[in-house]
Structures are given as C-alpha cells and as structure tokens.
Design a protein with these regions (language model features):
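Short glycine/serine/threonine-rich phosphate/pyrophosphate-binding segments
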Residues: 3-14, 35-37, 126-132, 154-157
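Glycine/aspartate-rich loop-and-adjacent alpha/beta segment that forms the canonical ThDP
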Residues: 147-168
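Glycine- and other small-residue-rich loops at beta-strand/loop junctions that grip anionic moieties
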Residues: 1-3, 98, 121-124
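C-terminal structured "cap/appendage" subdomains that terminate the fold
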Residues: 113-148
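A short, small-residue-rich loop immediately preceding and capping a beta-strand
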Residues: 1-9, 25-28, 143-149
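Active-site/ligand-binding loops adjacent to catalytic centers
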Residues: 22, 27-116, 162-168
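Short, ordered loop/turn segments at secondary-structure junctions
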Residues: 30-33, 125, 150
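Secondary-structure transition/capping motifs at alpha-helix termini
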Residues: 18-24, 137-141
Length: 168
C-alpha cells in the first residue's frame, strides 16, 4: 500500500512486486477534508482524461478542461493529476486505487505514532496507513500488509500541531 499524489513514490515502491499477480497493489490518494468537494484524488473520483505537464492522464478539471484547485492536509499529495503509469495500472486492473480523507490520515498518523515505536510517518504515508487500518480487519490473519512509510513527520510538524490543537 502506498500513497499516490503524482505517483513517483508508489512507482518506485511497487517496482519489485509489479510482476507478481498474487500481490495486490493499492494506491491511496488524498481525499481532502471530510464534507468538502475538494480533493486530490483523480483516479478514485473518476476524473476525466486531460493533459497536465505535457502528459495525458486523469486530471481534476472543470467542464472547460481548466485545472481545478485541489485540497489535502498533505502538501505532497495535493496535486490535480497522476502519473500516466498509474492511469495504466488502474485501467488494466493491476492496481487498485482508493482515497483517505484528511481526518482519516490524521487519525492513522496518531495511531501509528503511538503504537509502532518508530519515527512518526509524514502525512503522505499516513493516507496509506489509513487504508491499511481500514482493510486489515477484513483480511486473513496470514495476510501480510506492507505499507511504504515514505517520509517522517518532521516536515509536517506545524500542520500536525495545528490540526491537533498544539502550539509550537
């Protein structure tokens, strides 16, 4: 399971497993704030095909093809498009894409930080941890879940403190 904004982290993380059909690849996009129509999840929300930065891809856009504003607690996932590689993986069914809201990511951040005993994840992989937390109870106890914790929370400390009501 990997977070997906533009998609480079997931592409690198999945590289070793992409040819193994028995391994499910799950990409988690930024669903934005709960109750808001703004998000950064073009794959999950069936955004139309468009061109962004010279590449054809799913893009969050208006009826005229103009890029729309996105919103996410995670600056690293706050992006209106996604790599053409992920568009291909979605279309072929090789990867499954979902999203986690800002609130789900923050809850996952707190749970992982409290219980795992390693450096707290940044807000990007907290979206992936949110998906792992959602699906784990539905899986066999023999199932192995691997989550890419691709950054630590030091870079997000101001956002996290603000959202949790702490002063820095």
């Amino acid at each position: 399971i990997n977070c997906v904004g533009g998609g480079s982290s997931a592409a690198g993380f999945w590289n070793e497993w992409i040819d193994y059909d028995n391994i499910e690849l799950i990409g988690v996009e930024a669903g934005g704030p709960e109750g808001s129509s703004k998000h950064a999840a073009p794959l999950t929300n069936d955004s139309p095909i468009g061109v962004l930065h010279g590449a054809t891809q799913y893009v969050i856009q208006d009826d005229q093809g103009e890029i729309e504003e996105t919103e996410s607690i995670s600056a690293g996932l706050d992006y209106p498009g996604v790599s053409p590689l992920h568009c291909f993986l979605k279309e072929t069914g090789r990867a499954r894409y979902t999203s986690a809201s800002d609130e789900e990511a923050l809850d996952a951040f707190q749970l992982v930080s409290k219980n795992e005993g390693f450096v707290s994840p940044s807000l990007e992989p907290s979206h992936a941890f949110a998906e792992a937390i959602k699906i784990a109870p539905k899986l066999s106890k023999d199932t192995i879940i691997v989550v890419d914790s691709c950054g630590d929370s030091a870079k997000d400390s101001k956002i996290i403190a603000e959202r949790l009501g702490y002063k820095i």
